[in-house]
Amino acid sequence: IHGQIDGVDHPIAPTIVFANSLGTTLALWRKVLPLLPDGIRIIRYDLRGHGQSDIPDGPYTMGQLISDAAAICDAADVTDAMFVGLSVGGMIGQGLAVKRPDLIRALVLSNTAAKIGNQQLWDDRIAAVHAQGMAAMADTVMARWFGRDFANTPEVTPWQDMVSSANPKGYVGVCAAIAGTD
């Protein structure tokens, strides 16, 4: 799993771990970093099958995604971190707080739930990726993420590019993990 540490690189520094959403990379958080206070350690990582992380054959499970997050934290000697999770990143944070409470002091969860959608929704999304590719999926995702007026601005281009360039195998693998979570 590919991760990056920004800010203070010391285990005793207050730590924030960021886990991103399906189809995105750790670059998702880049505009947030300058807004954070000095003196903290910031850990971002690419989910399994995303960005610079390995892309193993799927399907993946939520347990694997949670174990990946734990491995990132263990490798950086994290204890007592604030975990910020967006969408599937929030699902991972919830699981990590249950399985490894030694790692988590606080959770910040956005656009997430204990279960997102149903099996049919994820089966349809997987089929759409196989049939139409990631560029078509990115169009669908942008329409869901952004309002119509904002979606037609150049500010959306980096987001569109991020999802369009996601590896289909990794995207589908994480879709399966979300579908299998209850």
Label every PLM stretch briefly.
Residues 65, 83-85, 110:
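Short beta-strand immediately N-terminal to the catalytic nucleophile in serine-hydrolase-like folds
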Residues 63-81:
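Conserved acidic catalytic loop of the alpha/beta-hydrolase fold
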Residues 91-99, 103-139:
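Flexible "cap/lid" loop of the alpha/beta hydrolase fold
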Residues 2-58:
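Conserved HGGG/HGGXW glycine-rich cap/lid loop of the alpha/beta-hydrolase fold
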Residues 117-120, 131-182:
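Conserved alpha/beta-hydrolase catalytic His-Asp/Glu region
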Residues 12, 38, 77-80, 101-102:
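Active-site acidic short loop of glycosyltransferases
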Residues 20-22, 81, 85-87:
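Conserved alpha/beta-hydrolase "nucleophile elbow" surrounding the catalytic nucleophile
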